[in-house]
Amino acid sequence: MEITFLGTSSGVPTRTRNVSSVALRLPQRKEIWLFDCGEATQHQLLRSDLRTSQIRRIFITHMHGDHIFGLMGLLASCGLAGTVSQIDVYGPPTLDRYIASCLRWSVMRLPYKLQVHTVEPGEVFSDGEFTVTCRLLHHRVPAFGYRVTEGDRPGRFHVEKAQALGIPFGPLYGQLKQGKTITLEDGRTFDGRDFCDPPQRGRSMVYCTDTVFCDSAVELAQQADVLIHEATFSHQEANLAFARLHSTSTMAAQVAAFAQVKLLFLTHFSARYAPGNPVQVEDLLAEAQAIFPNTRLAQDFLHYAIPRDGQICAEMPPSDSPAAANIDTLEATLEPLEAQTVAADAKNAPAIAINRATRQQMQQKLGIDATTANAILERRRQQKFTCLGELERLYPQVDWSALNVLF
Ligand SMILES: [Zn+2]
Ligand SMILES: [Zn+2]
């Protein structure tokens, strides 16, 4: 389960943050599930290393424009690409009418099956491997939080142990794998649980936006590996948060603490906290961390692979490190305005390029040896690179400046 943030701004896009969308990539089934689809989400997908053709399900939280205005464009482009056979869209009542109206009045015909599901609190989707549930949050219009839960996996079966005890091959091994007790013809009895490691706990991700603090978010997020929660406002703007039914940084942290999640990502920031303003997103992070220390800031294109063992993944730089924050600091320091956007794009292009490159390309274009290329590939396999600073820190011997020109 790999999360990529495609939009982390509330209401309107800023130069460095697009409006809401989060991609969940499920590598084992080559599928991407999107959560919200703000305007220009398809442009963000093109700038990421995700493949639009893998989008299989789209979950919409609510009908506000910053969460759905990119939906129709993306669905249309998926049709033109001709590589999609079915997309299922889930969302609140009126989403089906919105989609039907757009299709009708823009005379759009999709060459694939589009299934629109109106969700209600409870189970939304389940196929044995993954279950998606939702709860009604507390916003100005009906808004749903979603939880994706992966099923537990059976622990490893120690076949060599069974062989050593002389248990004959065949159906008995299947029964042992299932943890059942078997009796051999010679009268010996074995408990299958003695031959299997404990089951691997399935992972979970919860997405709560838009909402003011509410109990249903706490219930939905119980013990989740990752909670992505909106933090539109800083703590000192709590009055605004209550008036507009959005969350402050401290409300998000309280949900995380009450739900005992492992990791909290703050997202959906008001543009008033953009670089150069008196209060910035780093201040929201500090407020949240005072309540829930394991909090990080989401930023566009930030990638996080949820580890299987329930540990916090240490591969990603912490959100307040220079590497992760470099887009924001760039923007705060560079002039003129046009140069800022170009510089931010160019600065992180190498990270995107290296996430796509083959080993041969790396060796040729960067002039590095096979050992270094393999080390980079191995690191990439564990965790995609999110910014140039991370690459520079890990592999200072490589001249990264050539990458964005060459790939
Ligand atoms: Zn919103
Ligand atoms: Zn909203």
Swiss-Prot record:
Database matches in Gene3D superfamilies: Ribonuclease Z/Hydroxyacylglutathione hydrolase-like
Region named Ribonuclease Z: 1-308
Cofactor info, note text: Binds 2 Zn(2+) ions.
UniProt catalytic activity: Endonucleolytic cleavage of RNA, removing extra 3' nucleotides from tRNA precursor, generating 3' termini of tRNAs. A 3'-hydroxy group is left at the tRNA terminus and a 5'-phosphoryl group is left at the trailer molecule
Co-factor requirement: Zn(2+)
Location of the active site: D66 (proton acceptor)
InterPro entries assigned to the protein according to its UniProt record, in alphabetical order: Metallo-B-lactamas (IPR001279), RibonucZ/Hydroxyglut_hydro (IPR036866), RNase_Z/BN (IPR013471), RuvA_2-like (IPR010994)
Binding-site positions, Zn(2+) 2: D66, H67, D210, H268
UniProt key word Transport: no
Domain of life according to the entry: Bacteria
Protein EC: 3.1.26.11
CDD domains according to UniProt: RNaseZ_ZiPD-like_MBL-fold
KW Phosphoprotein (keyword) present: no
Residues that bind Zn(2+) 1: H62, H64, H139, D210
Molecular function GO terms recorded: 3'-tRNA processing endoribonuclease activity; zinc ion binding
Keyword list, A-Z: Endonuclease, Hydrolase, Metal-binding, Nuclease, tRNA processing, Zinc
A Pfam family annotated for this UniProt entry: Lactamase_B_2
Region Unknown: start-end pairs: 309-407
Functional description taken from the UniProt entry: Zinc phosphodiesterase, which displays some tRNA 3'-processing endonuclease activity. Probably involved in tRNA maturation, by removing a 3'-trailer from precursor tRNA.
Record-linked NCBIfam families: PRK00055.1-3, RNase_Z
Family matches, as PANTHER family: ZINC PHOSPHODIESTERASE ELAC PROTEIN 1 (PTHR46018:SF2)
HAMAP family, per the entry: RNase_Z_BN (MF_01818)
Quaternary assembly: Homodimer.
Sequence similarity: Belongs to the RNase Z family.
UniProt protein name: Ribonuclease Z
